[in-house]
């Protein structure tokens, strides 16, 4: 069932090539760090991806402490949903976005609680229940049906494929170059130190 859902989602994306709606100009990018940072990291992620959750648990806290909080690095989180559950979670994350990564961290830390279900509807139910349990204040149905946010999320994925040939998650782009080493903090730190 999951393979069928993923295949249907990919077909949906292929036929959704609309340009950004005018409203998208006011949708905030989920970021951390100073705009003036010398290094910009773009992280293409799917909220149902286990490796992405591991990045947020094992790599991101050190990256934030050593580079982002010191003004050396700015990170942008871009949506690359791999299935309908991730697509819906991305819409909720973007809708509830205050510009910081806190909603992403909440979704990744509780991923095993909500990223499950035999159907997209069941997974969406788990997502809603999880967010209610975490006291995340969001108009769930309105966010899921927001066309501007839907286009924004889909365009992140389309742009990732076109501009950087993203085909898996997480994919890390550093100053417009794909990071091709194993994604652990040691490798990332070594790479970033060469750019400072």
What do these predicted ranges mean?
Residues 81-168, 173-186, 190-196:
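Cysteine-centric redox/oxidoreductase cores and disulfide-bonded domains
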Residues 2-83, 87, 149-163, 194-196:
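Extracytoplasmic thiol/disulfide redox context detector
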């Amino acid at each position: 069932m999951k393979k069928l859902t993923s295949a249907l989602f990919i077909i949906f994306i292929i036929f959704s090539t609309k340009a950004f709606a005018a409203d998208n100009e006011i949708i905030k990018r989920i970021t951390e760090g100073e705009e003036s940072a010398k290094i910009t990291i773009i992280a293409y992620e799917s909220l149902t991806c286990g490796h992405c959750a591991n990045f947020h648990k094992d790599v991101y806290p050190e990256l934030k402490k050593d580079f982002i909080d010191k003004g050396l690095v700015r990170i942008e989180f871009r949506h690359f949903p791999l299935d309908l559950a991730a697509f819906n979670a991305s819409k909720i994350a973007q809708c509830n976005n205050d510009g910081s990564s806190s909603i992403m961290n909440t979704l990744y830390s509780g991923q095993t609680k909500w990223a499950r279900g035999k159907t997209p509807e069941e997974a969406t139910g788990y997502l809603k229940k999880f967010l209610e349990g975490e006291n995340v204040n969001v108009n769930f149905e309105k966010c899921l049906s927001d066309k501007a946010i839907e286009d924004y999320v889909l365009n992140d994925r389309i742009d990732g494929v076109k501009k950087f040939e993203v085909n898996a998650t997480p994919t890390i782009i550093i100053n417009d170059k794909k990071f091709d080493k194993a994604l652990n903090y040691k490798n990332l730190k070594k790479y970033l130190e060469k750019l400072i």
